[in-house]
Amino acid sequence: MRRSVFLVGLFIVLPMCARGQRAGEEKTPNTSPAVGVHYGSPMRISLAGGVLVDMSAHRNDGVVAMAEAGQQGNELSVGYFRMLGRFGSGYSLRAAALRTAGEPWNASPNTTYAGIEAHWMIAFGVGARVGYLRRTSKRVDDAHDNLASIGILVGL
């Protein structure tokens, strides 16, 4: 008798457990704004704005797309970001296109560069970036075919 009561109870409880494991509706990607101030080579001071598209419900990672306007150039970048912890720390790896203006640091004026950049935020959105870019526009007679972009950043 006990076995049959146990089996009946088990058949009643099991569907409830299975219902709790049923896949729910897929959430759409979560988007949030991204803004920051950068200082460094070649654009000097610049203001960046863009969007973060969080693709995972369990981790804070996804796609980042940014546009940056600076004193001596403009940049567009897109790539992958990953936030770590709760204090605004994380990193991003991006493909970047940069167009310099009149007097950039360590770069040719009025020249287009393309390459990769890595951004690392230590805490509270404060961090650094490094990148390697190569000239894609018409060659001029100077030594700036390759460009190392370096700088510090404060972002939200």
Pin down the residues of each PLM region:
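Cleavable N-terminal export/targeting peptides
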Residues: 1-26
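N-terminal targeting leaders of membrane proteins
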Residues: 17-40, 53
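Predominantly the C-terminal beta-signal and adjacent terminal strand-loop region
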Residues: 22-29, 115-156
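Residues that define the transmembrane beta-barrel architecture of outer-membrane proteins
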Residues: 27-31, 41-47, 71-76, 89, ...
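Polar/charged side chains located within well-ordered beta-strands of beta-rich proteins
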Residues: 31, 59-63, 74, 80-82, ...
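Transmembrane beta-strands of outer-membrane beta-barrel pores
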Residues: 37-43, 51-55, 67-73, 82-84, ...
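Repeated loop/turn-to-beta-strand initiation elements of outer-membrane beta-barrel proteins
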Residues: 54-63, 85-93, 122-130
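Outer membrane beta-barrel transmembrane domains
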Residues: 64-69, 81-83, 89-117
